Structure formats: structure tokens, C-alpha cells
């Protein structure tokens, strides 16, 4: 039995020797295989960074060049568009100048119909008889407004230029059964009133007229002369 165990050990030794086990363990110690050199070393990272910096700089320059080209094209297109618009607008400018001249001439003609009273201008219609509403429209067509009389001096000045007649002015009370007299120009109560005493308060649609240096009211659909003021504001 001792001899058979010895033969078994010798056989194992021969197999280990044939497999190169002695080469793997020099001086009786095992060693690991040498590691491979890594591809992404610090130097390689630096090279890649320089590459990307260069690439980004080139792309940035390329982008800036594209933007400059686009700006030049846009500027050129705008100049061309402006030139075309100037050409196309010339006839319109001529028409507008002509129209403005006509308006100015028309306004001058209309202003000749107004007379100066104090610091303001009024048109005293002495021939045409209209309802209060028609008189309002007529004054607007003259680029004026039914008169808002500001004080007694102005009232006396207007009536001094007018024959003894009744003249609509811009004061009315169109609400039945109550309400107050207002100016259509301001939407408020009038600046100045000088009422005639003992007036009929039962009249509907009461509109104000001046007569004999006093103010009275009548139904708005009655026909009377009227006074326009040149200014269209209060």
C-alpha cells in the first residue's frame, strides 16, 4: 500500500510539471498578469480637450459669419423695401397734401361765416329756421357746435349782432318729468344761464333759446334761428 501511494504522488507531480506549473510560480510565489495600458490617459484627455476647444472655436466663428451674412442681407432687404415704399407712397402723399389743402380752404371758407364776439367766434344764423336737432347738425357740419354762452357779456355781444329773434343754443332737457338742463358739448350743467321768469314747465323735450337778453325753453321740434360757436370743445 505504501508503494502504491508513492506511485500516485509521482504521477500527480509529473502532470503538474507538464502543465507548466513551475513557470507560474517562480521562487515558489504566484503572480497576477500585468494589466493592459488604459486608452484614456491624462495626456489623451488633454488632446481631446484641445480638439474640442478648437472645434468649438471654429463652429463659433462659422456661426458668427452666418449671423453677419444674415444681418447684411436683412439690412439690404430693408433698404430695398424702404425704397419701394417711398416710390409707392409718393402718389398717396400728393393726394393727402391736396386733400389737406382742400380741407384748409374749406375751413377758411366756413370760418368766414363766424363773427368775433369777445375772444370767441360765433355764427348767428339769421335766415334759416330749424328744429333744435337740425340746428345741432348744421353747426357740426360747419365744424362748429351749438353755442355755449359763458357769461352775460358774451350773451349781450351775440344779441347785439342779431336781429330781434329767437335763437337755439346748446342747452336742453330731453328727459320728461324731471331731469336737469345740460350742455351736449360738456355733458354737464351750463356755464351760464339767465332764465326768463314765469315759463311753462309742462313742455316736453325742453330746449333752450335766447331772446331779448334772456333764456327761455320751448319744445325742441319748434323751428327757430340758432347760434353756432366755432370751437368744438368746452
From Swiss-Prot:
UniProt KW Glycoprotein keyword: yes
Subcellular location(s) per record: Secreted
Disulfide bond sites: 139-228, 207-220
Glycan-bearing residues: 61, 164
Reported effect, residue 214 to D: In strain: Ma7
Record keywords, A-Z: Behavior, Disulfide bond, Glycoprotein, Lectin, Secreted, Signal
Result after altering residue 104 to E: In strain: SFS 1.2
Domain named C-type lectin: residues: 137-234
Alphabetized InterPro entries for the sequence: C-type_lectin-like (IPR001304), C-type_lectin-like/link_sf (IPR016186), CTDL_fold (IPR016187)
Distribution of this protein across tissues and organs: Main cells of the accessory gland and in seminal fluid.
Signal peptide: 1-21
Any Gene Ontology CC annotation: extracellular space
Biological process according to GO: sexual reproduction; sperm competition; sperm storage
Subcellular location, principal: secreted
Molecular function GO labels: carbohydrate binding; galactose binding; signaling receptor activity
Pfam family, one: Lectin_C
Segments traversing the membrane: none
CDD domains: CLECT (cd00037)
Entries under Gene3D superfamilies matching the protein: Mannose-Binding Protein A, subunit A (3.10.100.10)
Function: Responsible for physiological and behavioral changes in mated female flies.
Protein name (Swiss-Prot/TrEMBL): Accessory gland protein Acp29AB
